[in-house]
From Swiss-Prot:
CDD domains: PurM (cd02196). One of its GO terms (molecular function) is phosphoribosylformylglycinamidine cyclo-ligase activity. Keywords: ATP-binding, Cytoplasm, Ligase, Nucleotide-binding, Purine biosynthesis. Belongs to the AIR synthase family. It comes from the Bacteria. PANTHER family: TRIFUNCTIONAL PURINE BIOSYNTHETIC PROTEIN ADENOSINE-3, TRIFUNCTIONAL PURINE BIOSYNTHETIC PROTEIN ADENOSINE-3-RELATED. This is Phosphoribosylformylglycinamidine cyclo-ligase. It comes from Shewanella loihica (strain ATCC BAA-1088 / PV-4).
């Protein structure tokens, strides 16, 4: 009688040794993101973090997000570190809108077969995003799931927790008619609208490696999402900020109203900035209407800030000193009846 074949987890497609190799590869990158509030090291069942002692009435602010179908382009063109930055940016930029300082970040990486080099590149990008935002990469999960993903495909999710003083929470309630609106420039499409971007590439039959303003089109499309946390924390220390809107999926039409009272509308001056070339390329090659562009993409504006008119000059000076491309983009007006809450003129 033959002896039954002994099966292992590796025979089923899950390589524990590869997972351990990944952990070893990322330890130094994770260490760079350490904050003094973090207790313990990688490898525990739960990650521990104290609240910073400077807060008297701390409020925790949480956020979760992904990178969407930008991942498809990243996988196809083997550019994995940038999507790690994207993952962090999409979460921490949402937290800063509430006035919150990001404390810690966790990631979820899922794939059918773990490629240690690819995963290392992704997590190194995540660590870079955490370093840019002053946030500790406190833990994560790597899920190798045979039969769930094709080939080299993988998916990402990020989770972030920040803290803000209770009396300093930004919720849009302070916004009033007459407030000024400052814009912060984006680095490109960030992490939104990529299903449409991929459709434009398909329909136009454009070569993603073609030159656009001195570098390949694909490099414009995979440019990491800009992280605004550190300059905005400095701005919040110095100025009476009434609201901030992170321009993500839904563009101008969907995101700005999220931080406006019902009786207020944002009047945006469309001639106050020039769209980065990549957006003009998408609009032309996809035959996309202007309304749809503003509904899908950030069109060069990653963040909008509402504040009193008399603080505009000082705020712009601070933001530019921090390296931001910042400008006056419009103001807040009273809204009558069923008027739209965003007007681009």
């Amino acid at each position: 009688m033959s002896t039954p074949t002994q099966l292992s987890y590796k025979d089923a497609g899950v390589d524990i040794d590869a997972g351990n190799a990944l952990v070893d590869n990322i330890k130094s990158a994770v260490k760079r993101t350490h904050r003094p509030e973090v207790m313990g090291n990688l490898g525990g069942f739960g990650a521990l973090c104290e609240l910073p002692t400077k807060y008297k009435h701390p409020v925790l602010v949480s956020g979760t997000d992904g990178v969407g179908t930008k991942l498809r382009l990243a996988i196809d063109y083997q550019k994995h570190d940038s999507v790690g930055v994207d993952l962090v940016a999409m979460c921490v930029n949402d937290l800063i809108v509430a006035g919150a300082e990001p404390l810690f970040f966790l990631d979820y990486y899922a794939t059918g077969k773990l490629d240690v080099a690819t995963a290392t590149s992704v997590v190194n990008g995540i660590a870079e995003g955490c370093a840019q935002s002053g946030c500790a990469l406190i833990g994560g999960e790597t899920a190798e799931m045979p039969g769930m993903y094709e080939g080299e495909d993988y998916d990402l999710a990020g989770f972030c927790v920040g803290v803000v003083e209770k009396e300093d929470v930004l919720d849009g309630s302070k916004v009033v008619a007459g407030d000024a609106l400052i814009a912060l420039g984006s680095s490109g499409p960030h992490s939104n609208g990529y299903s449409l971007i991929r459709k434009v590439l398909e329909v136009s039959k454009a070569d993603p490696q073609q030159d656009l303003e001195g570098k390949p089109l694909i490099d414009h499309l995979l440019e990491p999402t800009k992280i605004y946390v550190k300059p905005l924390l400095k701005l919040l220390e110095k100025h009476d900020i009434h609201a901030m809107a992170h321009i993500t999926g839904g563009g101008f039409w969907e995101n700005i109203p999220r931080v406006l009272p019902n009786d207020a509308k944002a009047v945006v001056k469309g001639d106050s900035w020039q769209w980065p070339t990549v957006f003009n390329w998408l609009m032309e090659n996809g035959n996309i209407a202007e309304f749809e562009m503003y509904r899908t993409f950030n069109c060069g504006v990653g963040m909008i800030i509402a504040l009193p008119q008399d603080q505009v000059d000082a705020a712009l000076t601070l933001l530019k000193a921090e390296g931001e491309n910042a400008w006056l983009i419009g103001d807040i007006a009273s809204r009558n009846g069923d008027e739209e809450q965003v007007e681009i003129c």
